[in-house]
Amino acid sequence: MTPGEVRRLYFIIRTFLSYGLDELIPKMRITLPLRLWRYSLFWMPNRHKDKLLGERLRLALQELGPVWIKFGQMLSTRRDLFPPHIADQLALLQDKVAPFDGKLAKQQIEAAMGGLPVEAWFDDFEIKPLASASIAQVHTARLKSNGKEVVIKVIRPDILPVIKADLKLIYRLARWVPRLLPDGRRLRPTEVVREYEKTLIDELNLLRESANAIQLRRNFEDSPMLYIPEVYPDYCSEGMMVMERIYGIPVSDVATLEKNGTNMKLLAERGVQVFFTQVFRDSFFHADMHPGNIFVSYEHPENPKYIGIDCGIVGSLNKEDKRYLAENFIAFFNRDYRKVAELHVDSGWVPPDTNVEEFEFAIRTVCEPIFEKPLAEISFGHVLLNLFNTARRFNMEVQPQLVLLQKTLLYVEGVGRQLYPQLDLWKTAKPFLESWIKDQVGIPALVRAFKEKAPFWVEKMPELPELVYDSLRQGKYLQHSVDKIARELQSNHVRQGQSRYFLGIGATLVLSGTFLLVSRPEWGLMPGWLMAGGLIAWFVGWRKTR
C-alpha cells in the first residue's frame, strides 16, 4: 500500500469506530491481538451512543464521501443482505455534494468539443449548475443550431482516480468481512463490491448513458405512458452528455400533482405498466427509477405521462429469465409453492441436486404468512425478496439482473402507492403477465420463432449442399479407413481371437480422434481422449498377439 492509501484506510477505520460500528462484530470474533491493535492504533470511543446502529452507519458513510455514499445507496437495495432497519437508513443517503466551479465545467465542455469556445455551440450557457451530484453536474443552455433548450451533463474532473483509490480500499475491507462476521461468507462481500464497481464505472461513461436513453426513447416512441427526453449524440462524449431540457412535476410532489388535476389512480397504474412493459416486452429496463429521476408532464393531467431521466443504470433479462420470473409470480399468487420450487431448479438459479420437497416447504413457510394481508397490499418486490432469501439458503447464486429488477420493482411499488395508496399491483400486473406467457407458447410463438430464424436459414441455404457433401465425404472416408484396417487385421493369423477386437477398436478410436481433432477443434479434450483410448486398446491387442 502507498502512504496515501494507508492514511486513507486509517481515516476510514477511525470514522467507523467513532460511530461505534465495531458493534457489528461479535465479541467472540474480536481476538486479543485484534483488541490490542484496535486500542493502540485506533483509540476512538463511540461518539454517537444516542443513535441507533442503522443511523450511525448512514452518518459514517455520509462522512466518508461520494464513493461511500453511492456504495451505501446500492447496499440499501440489497435487502437480501441486511435487516430492514439498516436498509431503510441506507436508503436515506443523499447523493448531493457541493458543485465544482462552473468555469471548470465550461473548460471541460470546450475540450470535449474540440477546443472551440462554448459560445460556438451553445447560447445562454448558465455557469451556475442546475444540479450537482457525486459523479457529475448539470448546466443549462440552448443549442445554437436550432435554439432548443438543453441540459449539459459533465463528469466531475479527476473523479476517476478518487473512485479507484476508494474502491481498492473497499475491496481490502470486504476481504475481512468473512473473518469478522459469522454470516460473512453468505454475504459474499467481494461479489457485492465487484457489482458496485461495475455500476459505478458504467456511470462514468456518459456515452453509455446516452445510448441507454436513445434506446428507451425508441422503445416508448409515441407511447402515452412514458417520455424520454431527446439526446443529441453529436454533442456527446464519455465525459459529456447533451439532452433536451424537460419541465415536469417531481413524482414525489403529490400535492402539486393533485393541484394540477392529475388522475392519480391512472398515473399509479401506468407506473406498473411501464415497468412490466420494459421488462417483458423490451427486455431493457430503467434500473434507477427512484423519485429523483421520474417526473410527470404538466400537459393532459387527466391522461398523465411519466418523464424519465438519468438512464445510466439499466437492466436486461434473457428470454428464459423472463419466462421463469412471470411463471414464478403467477405460481406464487396461486399458492403453488411446488411450482415455484421447480421453477427455481429448472432455471438453474439453484443447484440441480436441490431437494425440491425441502425447498417447497421452506418457500411455503416464508411466503404463506404474506397472504394474511389483503391481496392489494402484497408487495411484488418483497415477494421476490422472500424468494431470493429462501433460495440463498439452498445455495442460489447471486443473479445481478434479478437484484436490479427487484430493486427497481421496490421503487415502482413505493412510488405507485405514494401516488395512490389503494393501488392493487397484482390486479394491474396479472393480465400483462398472463398475456405475455400465453404469447410465448402455441402457434403464434412458433410463427414468431420461424420469422426470427428465417433470415439466418436463408443466409446459410446456399452453403447447405456443400456442408452436406463435406459431411458425407468425411464420414465415407472415415468408414472406408476403418473397413480397410479391419480387413488388414482379419488377414493376420493371430494366436488369440480377442486381439482383433482390441486392434479394431483401437484403430477406430485413433482415427475418430484424429478426424475430430482436425474438423472439430472446439470439442476440446475429447479427440485426445479418443486417441489415448485407441492407443491403449491397440497396445492390449498387440500384447495378445505375443
From Swiss-Prot:
It is an enzyme of class 2 (transferase). One of its GO terms (biological process) is regulation of ubiquinone biosynthetic process. It is a multi-pass membrane protein. Pathway: Cofactor biosynthesis; ubiquinone biosynthesis [regulation]. GO terms for molecular function: ATP binding; protein kinase activity. Keywords: ATP-binding, Cell inner membrane, Cell membrane, Kinase, Membrane, Nucleotide-binding, Transferase, Transmembrane, Transmembrane helix, Ubiquinone biosynthesis. Residues 124-502 form the Protein kinase domain. It is found in: Cell inner membrane. Is probably a protein kinase regulator of UbiI activity which is involved in aerobic coenzyme Q (ubiquinone) biosynthesis. Belongs to the ABC1 family. UbiB subfamily. This is Probable protein kinase UbiB. It comes from Shigella sonnei (strain Ss046). The gene is ubiB.
